[in-house]
């Protein structure tokens, strides 16, 4: 039966550098200009969509950003076996216009607890303008957490969390760029979730 009045949702998948994650791109904005990570089922209170995705026994992480959902699967699951099921679920869920994120349920925590200095502003701008777009293309996100005595702490989310190549990207790519562009930066480290 054809539904009328609701948009037709199309979904395609993109592989990420992390073999355990897959990016499901949708022709609809899910969480415009924002991202939110659900590393486990207990953290899904703000997202009915994430909560339902965790009912699949092979899902171990959900990340929602702009127009895509990045899912992390269990090691014993083959993507080829579950992609059609996930795509069908997402299509039906979104065509029914069900809630993706309930903003009022999000508990915000301060991202930075130190002085907002010129160095911190430059770090945030570099992350926002250079790093974040590249990381999002791979189905992940990076969030600034802290800066203290030359050490920048970031949180890796989505496909970046647990990715075998994330430490290479962090050290060779992000840390190298920050050291060149912001001389005060001595090291970039990732905070575990």
Task: Cite the ranges covered by each PLM segment.
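Domain-level signature for proteins that mediate thiol-based redox and metal-cofactor handling
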Residues: 1-193
């Amino acid at each position: 039966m054809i539904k009328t009045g609701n948009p037709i949702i199309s979904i395609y998948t993109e592989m990420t550098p992390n073999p355990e994650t897959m990016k499901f791109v949708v022709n609809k904005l899910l969480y415009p200009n924002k991202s939110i990570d659900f590393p486990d089922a207990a953290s899904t209170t703000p997202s009915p969509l994430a909560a339902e995705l965790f009912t699949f026994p092979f899902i171990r992480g959900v990340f929602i950003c702009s127009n895509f959902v990045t899912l992390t699967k269990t090691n014993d699951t083959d993507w080829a076996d579950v992609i059609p099921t996930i795509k069908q679920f997402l299509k039906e869920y979104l065509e029914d216009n069900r809630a993706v994120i309930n903003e009022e349920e999000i508990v915000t925590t301060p991202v930075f607890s130190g002085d907002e200095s010129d160095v911190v502003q430059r770090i945030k701008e570099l992350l926002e303008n250079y790093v974040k777009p590249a990381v999002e293309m791979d189905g992940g996100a990076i969030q600034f957490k802290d800066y203290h005595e030359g050490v920048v702490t970031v949180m890796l989310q989505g496909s970046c969390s647990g990715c075998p190549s994330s430490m290479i990207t962090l050290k060779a790519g992000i840390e190298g760029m920050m050291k060149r562009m912001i001389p005060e930066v001595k090291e970039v480290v990732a905070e575990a979730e």
